[in-house]
A protein has these predicted regions:
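Expand to "…catalyze enediolate/carbanion chemistry for C-C bond making/breaking, isomerization
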Residues: 1-114
Length: 114
């Protein structure tokens, strides 16, 4: 039995499985299409989008995350708080993963992982 086709490829995950290092482009302020194009053309695998210290317009963030995926990049987002609702919002917006920078307890991290 074969596996079902992947609907959205996670390039960073594929690179990691191959044993190669993931090349990351950190995006702090400018969520512009040109950033995605430059990162993609230079061969980056992943965009790490900073949302912990920067407030981005939700529509702009969603467009940026989808554009990253459409250009073969894995958008990963830092999250400011350890809430399931916050993580769900970012994943629904198009992030393929998240970086939880400040879990206060192991229970918070476990709750997010569930």
């Amino acid at each position: 039995m074969t596996s079902p086709p992947v609907l959205i490829e996670n390039r960073a995950k594929s690179v990691l499985k191959s044993g190669d290092p993931i090349i990351v482009f950190n995006v702090f302020e400018s969520l512009r299409p040109s950033v995605v194009k430059i990162a993609s053309q230079l061969g980056f695998d992943m965009l790490l989008v900073e949302t912990e210290h920067m407030q981005h317009n939700p529509e702009t963030l969603t467009s940026f995350l989808v554009m990253a995926r459409d250009n073969g990049l894995s958008p990963i987002v830092t999250i400011p708080t350890a809430t399931r609702a916050g993580v769900a919002r970012l994943l629904d917006a198009g992030a393929l993963g998240f970086c939880l920078c400040h879990a206060e307890t192991s229970e918070q991290a476990d709750d997010i992982a569930r």
